[in-house]
């Protein structure tokens, strides 16, 4: 049977019988090492008794083996060619057949999903992208969209109102028109405070049985305590803590009148409350706010925090089933805004000239006359309302799960042109520009760009904070920067910046690239500009991103030395803004260029350009402050040695990370992603892990608020020097230990893997 099979098989190759061969690699006697001899099994059987070696092949057998070899070579060649071709097609940029294959694949996808972009073959670099961005922005008339948003169709648009929702839907439709990767809305049910539609708020002067009405204000302060209080009235300048400490009279049991400006309404009220005041009146004085209209009404809020104060630390989703609670930042005293005319009427019944150091007009007086009291009645009511945040995303091409967020407040009490229309208009135009750059010009961001329209910003960044609270556990792992576009143009003279230290260096480089539209000089004018950076305030939507979520944030504006006087008033109109800033279009265009360069730089570069080394100087400054109290610390039997060690570990970790970056293979996306992830952790790890986000939402040890902050630690030591009996040593010991371990934790996170951490702390 085997012989028949062999015979049949051999007939395929010329009819010659095939047999197994045996190769002998034995060294020959003559020394020739290259000779290979073959023995045919059939020949061996015929010559079993002889030692004769068969070395001659028949021609036809040779042809059969040659055919085998040729086929094998061809097959291996084809396999190698296909592997090489496919590998090459993946590595090179889209060319020739690869381009056609990729375009065909993308064309199929676009039929099913209109939001997908068709890749282009061009490759743009930083210089190309800057030029492209500038050209795109030059062709836009920003004032057109600002005027459109200022029409009666969309104003006034208090949070949750029908006009606010109308604008939300308009923005949502535009995002769809821009062909974003995805557009969605975020819905929350929040409690805000509004004026009572039946009972007015009222300020009166009571003198015995006489009641003299001062004003029934149209404006109000949201989240004020509702109720009535009566007492002596005293002036406390701007209502800062220092102002209260320097007063020559007590405010205990009295109402306080303070000027608007310098700090937020909420901080003024909290300070007054801490000095046992029973109520607060806020007005705009002539020097700080040189407005013509003495009876101008204005609006604000008194929540010392952000977000919905009735769901502190957790999101206001409709299905949330937490028991009723409220933020500790809500005031326990009534607060009301009054016009300048009402304030001057009160001053006529007061005595004592205000100090010259206050730099205030002569009408200002200090204390209400004897036998007179002021009565404040606040009838504000809570209202539950639905709010909508609108989002659109351009997904990154390399790391779509890493994103920058660009946002602007949409709502406003009154017309809100400078407060929200400028920022919203800028947001929409930036979204359109980046959509065009990707779909038409070949821009390929490595990371994603999220455009966000927030509402309820007038009540303390409620929309933005609720979104952050809803995704607290994951956002810091994904979002690496927030850019705030609120109030970007309030003047022309100054360019002011508030930001995380991680963004200082990048902002400086952008300022060296962008020119002021009026004088033509670069925005970078002073090598010491970092010292002029202002901290993010509570009423800035970027604040909760930084202090609550640990996401680096930046906010900037073109403005004057004085505050813009019409924010939060019925005169925040397009006509007045264009009167104050005739070059509005150029100023908004420049603000767009600053924001646009931020977006490009942070989504285009392989390295995440966050300067983690900037916190070295912040830590050093903190250590210098502590050194003033070395003797006090020693008296308590404590040492700063471990704090020095933690700061040193942070310095070494930043140096090691910089070295790792310089030594890294920049084309290796996996290596660069690991380095970028370490950089992303820096800001988040400055949030104290030892306090609850519900009890102390702003956990950042540099920019937050509470006993866990570094500033609170220093203040506690100052208190020891002033009044040792009021000093709490146990609290200080906890503050010192937890601050040390928080800083050490940041150093450990920067170091990378656990085996790279110096454990000799």
UniProtKB/Swiss-Prot annotation:
Coiled coil: none
PTM text: Stearoylated by ZDHHC6 which inhibits TFRC-mediated activation of the JNK pathway and promotes mitochondrial fragmentation. Stearoylation does not affect iron uptake. N- and O-glycosylated, phosphorylated and palmitoylated.
Region of interest called Ligand-binding, as start-end residue ranges on this chain: 570-761
Organism, as annotated: Rattus norvegicus (Rat)
Motif Endocytosis signal in this chain: 20-23
Subunit structure: Homodimer; disulfide-linked. Binds one transferrin molecule per subunit. Interacts with SH3BP4. Interacts with STEAP3; facilitates TFRC endocytosis in erythroid precursor cells.
Protein name as it appears in the record: Transferrin receptor protein 1
A single GO cellular-component term on record: glutamatergic synapse
Membrane-protein topology: Single-pass type II membrane protein
Function: Cellular uptake of iron occurs via receptor-mediated endocytosis of ligand-occupied transferrin receptor into specialized endosomes. Endosomal acidification leads to iron release. The apotransferrin-receptor complex is then recycled to the cell surface with a return to neutral pH and the concomitant loss of affinity of apotransferrin for its receptor. Transferrin receptor is necessary for development of erythrocytes and the nervous system. Positively regulates T and B cell proliferation through iron uptake.
GO molecular function: double-stranded RNA binding; Hsp70 protein binding; identical protein binding; protein homodimerization activity; protein kinase binding; protein-containing complex binding; protein-folding chaperone binding; transferrin receptor activity
Family: Belongs to the peptidase M28 family. M28B subfamily.
Tissue: In testis, expressed in Sertoli cells, peritubular myoid cells and in germinal cells. Highest levels in Sertoli cells.
Residue ranges annotated as motif Cell attachment site: 647-649
Residues bearing a lipid moiety (S-palmitoyl cysteine): 67
Every PA domain range: 229-346
């Amino acid at each position: 049977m085997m012989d028949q099979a062999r015979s049949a098989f051999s007939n395929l190759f010329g009819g010659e019988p095939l047999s197994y061969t045996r190769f002998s690699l034995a060294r020959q006697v003559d020394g020739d090492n290259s000779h290979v001899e073959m023995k045919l099994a059939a020949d061996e059987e015929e010559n079993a008794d002889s030692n004769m070696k068969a070395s001659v092949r028949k021609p036809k057998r040779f042809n059969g083996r040659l055919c085998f070899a040729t086929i094998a070579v061809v097959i291996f060649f084809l396999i190698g060619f296909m592997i090489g071709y496919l590998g090459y097609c993946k590595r090179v940029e889209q060319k020739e057949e690869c381009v056609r294959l990729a375009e065909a694949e993308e064309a199929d996808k676009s039929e099913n999903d209109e939001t997908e972009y068709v890749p282009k073959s061009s490759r743009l670099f930083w210089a190309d992208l800057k030029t492209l961005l500038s050209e795109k922005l030059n062709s836009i008339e920003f004032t057109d969209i600002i005027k459109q948003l200022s029409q009666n169709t969309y104003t006034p648009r208090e949070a949750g109102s029908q006009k606010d929702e109308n604008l939300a839907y308009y923005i949502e439709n535009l995002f769809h028109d821009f062909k974003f990767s995805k557009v969605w809305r975020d819905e929350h049910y929040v409690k805000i405070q509004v004026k009572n539609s039946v009972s007015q708020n009222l300020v009166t002067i009571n003198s015995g049985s006489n009641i003299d009405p001062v004003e029934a204000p149209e404006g109000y302060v949201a989240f004020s305590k509702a109720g009535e209080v009566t007492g002596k009235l005293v002036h406390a300048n701007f209502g800062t803590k220092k102002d209260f400490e320097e007063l020559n009279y007590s405010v205990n049991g009295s109402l306080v009148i303070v000027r608007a400006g310098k700090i937020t309404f909420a901080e003024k009220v909290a300070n007054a409350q801490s000095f046992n005041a029973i109520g607060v009146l806020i007005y705009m004085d002539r020097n700080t706010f040189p407005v013509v209209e003495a009876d101008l009404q204005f609006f604000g809020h008194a929540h010392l925090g952000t977000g919905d104060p009735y769901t502190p630390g957790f999101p206001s989703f409709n299905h949330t089933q937490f028991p009723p609670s409220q933020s500790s930042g809500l005031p326990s005293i009534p607060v009301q805004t009054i016009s300048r005319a009402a304030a001057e009427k009160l001053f006529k019944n007061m005595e004592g000239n205000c100090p010259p150091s206050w730099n205030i007009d002569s009408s200002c007086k200090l204390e209400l006359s004897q036998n007179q009291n002021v009565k404040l009645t606040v009838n504000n009511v809570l209202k539950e309302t639905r709010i909508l945040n609108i989002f659109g995303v351009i997904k990154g091409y390399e790391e779509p799960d890493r994103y920058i967020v660009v946002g602007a407040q949409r709502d406003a009490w009154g017309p809100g042109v400078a407060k929200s229309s400028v920022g919203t208009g800028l947001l929409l135009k930036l979204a359109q520009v980046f959509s065009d750059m990707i779909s038409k010009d070949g821009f390929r961001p490595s990371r994603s760009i999220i455009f966000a329209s927030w509402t309820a910003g007038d009540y303390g960044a409620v929309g933005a904070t609720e979104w952050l609270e809803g995704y607290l556990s994951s956002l810091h792992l994904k979002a690496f920067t927030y850019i705030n576009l609120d109030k970007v143009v309030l003047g022309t003279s100054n360019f002011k910046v508030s930001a995380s230290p991680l963004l200082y260096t990048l902002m400086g480089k952008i300022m060296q690239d962008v020119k002021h539209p009026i004088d033509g000089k670069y925005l970078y004018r002073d090598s010491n500009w970092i010292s002029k950076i202002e901290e993010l305030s509570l009423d800035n939507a970027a604040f909760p991103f930084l202090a609550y979520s640990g996401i680096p944030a930046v906010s900037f504006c073109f403005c004057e030395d004085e505050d813009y006087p019409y924010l939060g008033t019925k005169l925040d109109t397009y006509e007045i803004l264009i009167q104050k800033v005739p070059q509005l279009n150029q100023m908004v265009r420049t603000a767009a260029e600053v924001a646009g360069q931020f977006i490009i730089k942070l989504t285009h570069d392989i390295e995440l350009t966050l300067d983690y080394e900037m916190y070295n100087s912040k830590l050093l400054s903190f250590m210098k402050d502590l050194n003033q109290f070395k003797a006090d610390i020693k008296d308590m039997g404590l040492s700063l040695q471990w704090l020095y060690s933690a700061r040193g570990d942070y310095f070494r970790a930043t140096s090691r990370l910089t070295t790792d970056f310089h030594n890294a293979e920049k084309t290796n996306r996996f290596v660069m992603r690991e380095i970028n992830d370490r950089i992303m952790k820096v800001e988040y790890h400055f949030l104290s892990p030892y306090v609850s986000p519900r009890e102390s939402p702003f956990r950042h040890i540099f920019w937050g608020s509470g006993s866990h902050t570094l500033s609170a630690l220093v203040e506690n030591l100052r208190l020891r020097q002033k009044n040792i009996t009021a000093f709490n040593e146990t609290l200080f010991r906890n503050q010192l230990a937890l601050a040390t371990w928080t800083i050490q934790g940041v150093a450990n996170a920067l170091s990378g893997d656990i085996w790279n951490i110096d454990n000799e702390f």
